[in-house]
Amino acid sequence: MTANTGEPYKRHSNESPVDRNINVNAIQSDKFLSLLLSMVPVVCQTGQEERLKKVNGLTPIGYGFNIRTDQHLEFHNLSEPNYLGNGLHCSSLCSTNYDFDGYDYCDGINASETDAMLQDSRSSADGDKDALVEGSKKQTKESSIAMALQILVPFLLAGFGTVSAGMVLDIVQHWDVFKNLTEVFILVPALLGLKGNLEMTLASRLSTAVNVGKMDSPIEKWNLIIGNLALKQVQATVVGFLAAVFAVILGWIPDGKYQLDHAILLCSSSVATAFIASLLQGIIMVGVIVGSKKTGINPDNVATPIAASFGDLITLAILAWISQGLYNCLGSYAFVSPLVGVFFLAMTPIWIVIASKHPATRTVLHSGWEPVITAMLISSIGGLILDTTVSDPNLVGIVVYTPVINGIGGNLVAIQASRISTYLHLYSIPGELPEDAKGCYHPCRTFCGTGVNNKSAQVLLSLVIPGHLIFLYTIYLMKSGHTSLTPIFVAVYLLAALLQVFALLWIADWMVHHIWRKGKDPDSFSIPYLTALGDLLGTALLAISFHILWIIGDRDGDVGD
């Protein structure tokens, strides 16, 4: 595609296909880079663009897509008999009075990868239409029980992963680097939030691609995978560096001073952790998506929880190990910290070149930074709350529960966001909401009703209390933490967790539809915001809960002491 160049496409009826492979002669002087680039397939660019040119009635112009009214009607007539969503499908969406020729799908220059990855699924060949019909049938046949059973196992796996992360954090908080360089605590929610910024976004994006039939071709599948992994590494490196800079600033504000070697250590630890953890989790996530497709499981239900099942544990363990190692080198090997940071930052241009070669990720590479960076800033504020709370010796018990409440809330809201996004991709067009999705968003609209999105919200909310009870009891059996499970503590903790997920699901219902109405892809834009809000809400509510428990006299701290 050339949507990012602003050059229009024109249909050629009797001309031979145009070769649009990217010329990399300009960089062939670097033999290593040339070898690396030669390993990356670029066939999908030619294939996708030529299919777009051959589509009857579709002429992409710049950032927008002009669609003929009769073709749009044909698409909706095809999918309309299978529609069993939140309400009756309103035919006004396909009214001939609507000016489709003048409609800009991508809302100006803010084009999203929805168009690069999914645009021909709305108007291309019959095979794509069949894939849409098949996907909608799968969704309409999914009952609440089947949905709950599919979500339950990965939800429990993700929960035990967050429990493990909390236990690790409870141990490493006593390490020298965490005691002498408390700004590391500010990094914890931001780096763990990369799971929501990157891993869950990747899972949701690929899940949507699977459900609309865009990963049926092996060439398209591997081009999507390689492009998304390269994009994720770029984002992880940049966000890791910015998170460290923000942590240094937040640590400098209270006292008005900082040490340069500590600032370099934070930056190097953050960048290295983000890069390594993101690469490992990305490979795992690709395996989960491909495996779900082969086994017939809806990846929307399992991909996002599994993306977080061991993500927190891996990220936290890598952060603790690298930061402690670099801290030990401060005295005699001071050059190690800057060397580590420079090494990982120097690899960023390579990933940028690879990601820019794939149409599914090229647009996100230019316009997808806003949600990722904003989410990092929101998570860092949660980290500041955690750092302040941990500094109080009476409230150290919060450490073991913070990854649990944040991780569970982020997992559940990511599932809901991914399902709503898939629903919109199947039954609507970017920039236009279904008739039943218009109006004011309130809790009753989110949780009351018989639509597929209402049912999923009900199922996810019902998992909060039993899930957290299991995880609390697991922490108790493992003798971890500094707080006993008194009835008052359990009640206050469960109330905080329930309020967090309730608010997140409500916000997700509004945010996903709002982003879709703006012509952007909710898979890339909503999940980072939602998981970051989950981190902030979870940490804040947990801190308030511990303060309340301390005030009313529930101060037992013998467990794990």
Curated annotation (Swiss-Prot):
Compartments where found: Cell membrane
Gene3D superfamilies from the UniProt entry: SLC41 divalent cation transporters, integral membrane domain
SUPFAM superfamilies, sorted: MgtE membrane domain-like (SSF161093)
The keyword Hydrolase appears for this protein: no
GO biological process: cobalt ion transport; iron ion transport; magnesium ion transport; manganese ion transport; nickel cation transport
InterPro entries assigned to the protein according to its UniProt record, in alphabetical order: SLC41_membr_dom (IPR006667), SLC41_membr_dom_sf (IPR036739), SLC41A1-3 (IPR045349)
Extracellular side: 1-150, 205-233, 292-301, 355-364, 416-457, 509-531
Gene Ontology molecular function: any one: monoatomic cation transmembrane transporter activity
Main location: membrane
Catalytic reaction list: Mg(2+)(in) = Mg(2+)(out); Mn(2+)(in) = Mn(2+)(out); Co(2+)(in) = Co(2+)(out); Ni(2+)(in) = Ni(2+)(out)
Transmembrane segments: 151-171, 184-204, 234-254, 271-291, 302-322, 334-354, 365-385, 395-415, 458-478, 488-508, 532-552
Record membrane topology: Multi-pass membrane protein
Cytoplasmic side: 172-183, 255-270, 323-333, 386-394, 479-487, 553-561
Keywords for this protein: Cell membrane, Ion transport, Magnesium, Membrane, Repeat, Transmembrane, Transmembrane helix, Transport
GO CC terms, sorted: plasma membrane
Similarity comment text for this entry: Belongs to the SLC41A transporter family.
Function: Acts as a plasma-membrane magnesium transporter. Can also mediate the transport of other divalent metal cations in an order of Ba(2+) > Ni(2+) > Co(2+) > Fe(2+) > Mn(2+).
Record's protein name: Solute carrier family 41 member 2
